[in-house]
Amino acid sequence: MGQSKKLNKQPRSLSPLVLLSGISKSFDGKEVISQLDLTINNGEFLTLLGPSGCGKTTVLRLIAGLETVDAGHIMLDNQDITHVPAENRYVNTVFQSYALFPHMTVFENVAFGLRMQKTPAAEIAPRVTDALRMVQLEEFAQRKPHQLSGGQQQRVAIARAVVNKPRLLLLDESLSALDYKLRKQMQNELKALQRKLGITFVFVTHDQEEALTMSDRIVVMRNGVIEQDGTPREIYEEPKNLFVAGFIGEINRFDATVIERLDEQRVRASVEGRECNIYVNFAVELGQKLNVLLRPEDLRVEEINDDNHIEGLIGYVRERNYKGMTLESVVELENGKMVMVSEFFNEDDPDFDHSLDQKMAISWVESWEVVLADEEHK
């Protein structure tokens, strides 16, 4: 988002494991994936993120071999697997429902895949024990699924998937059935397990916080196409368009109009009716409409108690929400636009707990803003 928040974009020297090239897929005449290209690297935790119906689960099912492509190719470890049956792909999937066999013990559930592959009997017990030890369920080996918590069942499903030593593990919304506290715990455990195993994980979710917490890389999808592909920080701090900006966390969008270019980096603009300097790294014209994007935590607010010269936008506190570590305020600008501001709680600041209807000045550190061309006026 600019100078002091500039991201370190060293090239990632990872080797590709999966290549999707020109993938298209339709159901009942409706195209759900359109000419999609995606590289998944060895050993990374990649998340496919997007709203319901964006095509993320279809991509997962195409990689797994549970659906067939209409066009394009899928490569795994330099082998074309586009038409290889699912059972021969060295890819395992953990579904939202876990689908454990209720009549089998935990041990038997994990061993099932090995027996189906006709693994020598002498290998089965040590491999199952190793897999259960990895997910910290060794002592639960003789229990039935109904005797386990939701989080434990989820770990059994993962152990069953990794015991076959897949090159790739696919997880389809596999934490969504858990309660909030257990989800948070499982996010940390899943990421730690992925690091320990060194297996490539591809995780599908619509939960932005989950994606930011767990991923090495996030692929944001909408209507069957990739909107942005980057690290969690890149996606959060440097969104490429308004959809990504609005989908990942809270963000304020300000309307701006170019007044003049000041230098190579900065433009003088009218932002919601107030003149400000903004950082714009693309060519603009006089009078051009822009979008200025700022996260609530990137805004600074100051109470106005006199008529001294005021920098920034002017508004009035309309709502306050105490969130423990932060105080979130809704400020109404003079033109009626509502702005969200998030401040870290500071009980030693006498002006911190703002009164309703208090007049405020809103500003930000120059260059922390993201500026995008107005998509409606290109």
From Swiss-Prot:
Chain sites annotated for binding ATP: 50-57
EC number: 7.6.2.11
Keyword Oxidoreductase found: no
Any GO molecular function: ATP binding
Pfam family, one: ABC_tran
A cellular component annotation (GO) from this entry: ATP-binding cassette (ABC) transporter complex
Enzyme class label: translocase
CDD domains: ABC_PotA_N (cd03300)
Keywords noted in UniProt: ATP-binding, Cell inner membrane, Cell membrane, Membrane, Nucleotide-binding, Translocase, Transport
Membrane-topology annotation of the record: Peripheral membrane protein
Entry function: Part of the ABC transporter complex PotABCD involved in spermidine/putrescine import. Responsible for energy coupling to the transport system.
Family from the record: Belongs to the ABC transporter superfamily. Spermidine/putrescine importer (TC 3.A.1.11.1) family.
PANTHER family per record: SPERMIDINE/PUTRESCINE IMPORT ATP-BINDING PROTEIN POTA (PTHR42781), SPERMIDINE_PUTRESCINE IMPORT ATP-BINDING PROTEIN POTA (PTHR42781:SF4)
Subunit structure: The complex is composed of two ATP-binding proteins (PotA), two transmembrane proteins (PotB and PotC) and a solute-binding protein (PotD).
Protein name: Spermidine/putrescine import ATP-binding protein PotA
Organism expressing this protein natively: Salmonella typhi
